[in-house]
């Protein structure tokens, strides 16, 4: 009985902490068109790196509304981003050290307006404090794709 009570209290505490973080799971209901490959290495056995992508929809007035987060815990993750609508993607690389007690977050942000019939291949890499994100657009009817130019939220009125 006491063990069951401990498990219930621990589960409730974990749920409360998760709820207090302000992060919610992205409601991934669109057809999968963003394929993210993640490579993250801290370079140390005493440190850890976590990678996530926070997805926002952008309205006609260039205001971003947070929709949710996808944790990039697997080497490859498929996400559905609505087509023909401007989205703001925020890749976050969170590093923490067990011995030094230090931590930090690096962000890579860009606007993306997925086109119908196209796929988007993203690579999110982090190694020894250096991050790199590349997003490529591919049209299955054409051989060559193109790299998506990084654009900030302040550029949302400009079509890419």
Across the structure, where does each feature detected by a protein language model lie?
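Sec-dependent bacterial lipoprotein signal peptides
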Residues: 1-22
């Amino acid at each position: 009985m006491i063990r069951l009570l401990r498990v219930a209290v621990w589960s409730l505490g974990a749920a409360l902490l998760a709820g207090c973080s302000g992060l919610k799971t992205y409601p991934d209901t669109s057809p999968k068109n963003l394929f993210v490959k993640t490579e993250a290495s801290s370079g140390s056995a005493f440190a850890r790196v976590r990678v996530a992508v926070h997805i926002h929809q952008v309205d006609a007035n260039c205001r971003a509304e947070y929709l949710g987060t996808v944790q990039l815990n697997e080497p490859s993750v498929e996400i559905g981003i609505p087509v023909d609508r401007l989205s703001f993607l925020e890749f976050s690389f969170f590093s923490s050290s067990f011995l030094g007690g230090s931590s930090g977050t690096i962000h890579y942000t860009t606007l993306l307006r997925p086109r119908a019939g196209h796929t988007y291949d993203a690579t999110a890499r982090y190694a020894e404090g250096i991050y790199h994100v590349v997003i490529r657009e591919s049209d299955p009817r054409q051989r060559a794709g193109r790299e998506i130019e990084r654009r900030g939220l302040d550029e949302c009125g400009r079509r890419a």
